Amino acid sequence: DKQFHREYLAKDITNYGGGNNRGPQLWEGKAISWHSQMQFAGRITKTRVPDHGWYRITIHDLDAINPGSDGYLWGTLQTGSGYSNEPLLYPLGIVEATQQSKTKILEGWMQKDHMLVFKPNEANLKNLPSKGGSFSFEGRNFEKMGFAGFRFEKITIERIYPVGDRKKVRSHLFADFDLEELKA
């Protein structure tokens, strides 16, 4: 099996090009994924994985911007194609953040060519304004405007093998069974 290990710095996963921008904002060297109820908000297009499999996702130096009155901000980490031609998103986990930075590690199954979708996801939060299905960050300070967001330094994605690589799994399943006997 191929090894896969990638580190995505904030500057690598934020997008300000034209088109349908729904990804994180780059602000003071960190990525910020803001709350929005728009479909696929929080998608991180560069995090597509090359194969179906189990992955460990590490969100480094994560903290909450404008958390709720209890000091917490809750959200979701999901995977999917990130586009309307394949609209389903698959849960990887629930994420909790406070104003104190921490590293979060989640593990889950990802399909080939799927990306991460990461955003705050509480119903009572202010919804980030969007125009034409896209976010415009230019000239706006969403933190000062009271919007909630997840701020982080980078994301690491690595392929893992919880019960072993392909050879080890085959050994566990079939032990000493000779597959050639079936052909006879």
Locate predicted features.
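Low-complexity, glycine/serine/threonine/alanine-rich intrinsically disordered linker
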Residues: 1-184
